[in-house]
Amino acid sequence: MRFQSINEINLTSVWAQLHLHQRSTRHVEMRDLFEAESDRFLNFSIDLNGFLLDFSKNRITGRSLDLLVELSKVAGLSDWVEAARLGEQINTSEHRAVMHFALRASVDDVYSVDGQNVVPVVHRELRRCFDFSEKIRQKIWCGFNGSPIRDVVNIGIGGSDLGPRLAVQALHPYALSDIRVHFVSNLDGADLAQTLEGLDQATTLFIVSSKSFSTPETLDNAYAAKAWFLQKAQGSDVSKHFVAISSNVEAVKDFGIAPEQMFRFWDWVGGRYSVWSAIGLSVMIAIGERHFRAFLDGAREMDQHFFTAPHEKNIPVVMALLGVWYNTFYGAHTHAIMPYAHGLARLPAYLQQLDMESNGKRVGRFGEMLDFDTGPVVWGEVGVNSQHAFFQLLHQGTRLVPCDFILPLRSHYAIGQHHQQLVANCLAQTEALMRGKTDTEVLEELQAAGVTGELLDALLPQKVFPGNQPSNTIVIDELSPHFLGMLLAAYEHKVFVQGVIWGINSFDQWGVEYGKQLAKRIAPELASTKPPKHDSSTNALIERYRTRGCRS
C-alpha cells in the first residue's frame, strides 16, 4: 500500500497503538529489562558476516519491535523497495528513478531504468575509471614536464566531496604512500589556498566533480585552481592535469577538459549516494581497483541483505524503525554518531548530508504538509574526543539523545594498548548510558570514600546518572573497504526506509535552492553603491561589508 494523501499513515491503527505503547512504557528502565531478560542481546542483535548491529540497549520490548515492524508493512515498505529495484520513478518530484545500488551491482545483476539494464554501462564507466586511476598509480600518466603525479586535488561540494573525503581517510591504510589526495569544497579561498601550499603544478592532478558542471562553489574553485596551474604551465597542458566527473560534455569542454577525460554518472544517482560511481575516482586512485571493488562488494552485500531479510532481522530496517520510534514518537529530534575509529572522523559530516538532506522535510511526497516530526538533526564526533566534548550532556542533561556507536574490533595501527583502551571506552559508554548510576549506588560510593555531612548532601545529586539513554552499537571486524561499504550502504537504506514511513521523497533537496537564489542577488550588491533592498538586518550587513570588508 502506498499512501496518496496527507495523514494516512498517522491515522492508522498501528500508529495509534505505537503512541499508546510509548506512553505505557516510557518509564521502563533498560537496566531492568536486561536484568529480566537473560537473552536480551540475542533477541535484539543482528550479525551479518562480521557486521553486528546490537540494538539491545534501546527503550524497546518485543512488543515495541513488533509494532514498528507492522508500521513498516502498513507503510508499504516492501512495495517501495521493489519499486526502487525495478527502476520506477520513486523520486517523484523530479520524475527520476533511484538506482545508486546499481553502482555496486555484479555483472550478472539486472537493474533497469526506462527499460534498459544499466549494469553494463555502469561497469564500462567503472572500467574507464579504474584504467585511468591505474595510470596515475603506476606513474604512466605524467604531468607536462614528464614527472609523475604526486598530488590529487578533488574539487567538489556536498556529495562530490563528503563521500570521497570520508572514504580516503577511512581507508588510508590501503592507500599508496607516494600519492597524496586532497579535497577542496569550501568557497572560502583559504581552503584552496592552503591546499595548494607546497604543491607543484607539474605533479598535481585536479578532479573537478560536478554533475551539471555549473555548481558555483565548485566552478569558482576550479577556475581558481586553473589560474594557479597556468602560472607555471601552458593552456595546452590543462588536459594533462584536469579531469572532470560530470554529465555535461559541453561545459566540460568549455573549461578546457577533453571529453575523453570526463567520467560520467547519471541522473538516477543522487549526489549524496554517488561515492560508488566515478565521483569516487579520488578513492580509486588512493586505494586501487582491488580495494575499491571490495568497497563496492561490501555495499552490495548490505544491499542483498536489505532486499531479502525479513524486516525484524534486517539491519537497515531496524535502524530506521528505531529512529522513527525516537524521533516521531518520543520527540527526540536529534541523533548522535560516535565512531570509535579515527578513520571515521568524517562519518558524522557524511551522515549529516545523507540523512538531513534526504529527510529534513515537512512536505510529503505528494505536496502535503506533514503534521508529525520527521528527520532528526544528525551530529557527532569521533571516539573518546566526543567523551570530552558533549558526553556530559548525554549522561546528565535533560534531553533524550539516541546514539550510534561504531566500533572496529581490530586496528591497523598496533601501538601499545591503544586499541584495547579504545574498545573499553566505547563499551563502557554504551553501558553507562544504558545503566546509569542510582542515588543509592552513589551514596554507597561516597560513604565508602568517607564523605559525610553537608559535602555528601551536596555531591550526591551531582553524581547520579539517570541512564536509560538509548544507543545502537555497530561492531565491525575492522575498518576495511568491505566493511566500510557495508556501513555506508546500511545508512543509505536506513534513510530510505524512514522516508517511506514518513511519506517523504528522500531523493530531492529543494531546501538548498532558495539560499543560492538570494546569494546570486546579493553578490553584485556587495560591490554596488546603490541602497540594498532587503530587510533591515540584511541591508545593514551588506553595508557593513561595503565599508569594512575587502572587495575582490
Swiss-Prot record:
Catalytic activity: alpha-D-glucose 6-phosphate = beta-D-fructose 6-phosphate
SUPFAM superfamilies: SIS domain
Domain of life: Bacteria
Keywords from the named record: Cytoplasm, Gluconeogenesis, Glycolysis, Isomerase
PROSITE patterns documented for this protein: P_GLUCOSE_ISOMERASE_1, P_GLUCOSE_ISOMERASE_2, P_GLUCOSE_ISOMERASE_3
GO biological process: one example: glycolytic process
Compartment(s) of residence: Cytoplasm
GO annotation, cellular component aspect: cytosol
Active site: E357, H388, K516
Pfam families (UniProt xref): PGI (PF00342)
GO molecular function, one term: monosaccharide binding
Gene3D superfamilies in UniProt: 1.10.1390.10, Glucose-6-phosphate isomerase like protein, domain 1 (3.40.50.10490)
Family: Belongs to the GPI family.
Name the record gives this protein: Glucose-6-phosphate isomerase
Organism: Laribacter hongkongensis (strain HLHK9)
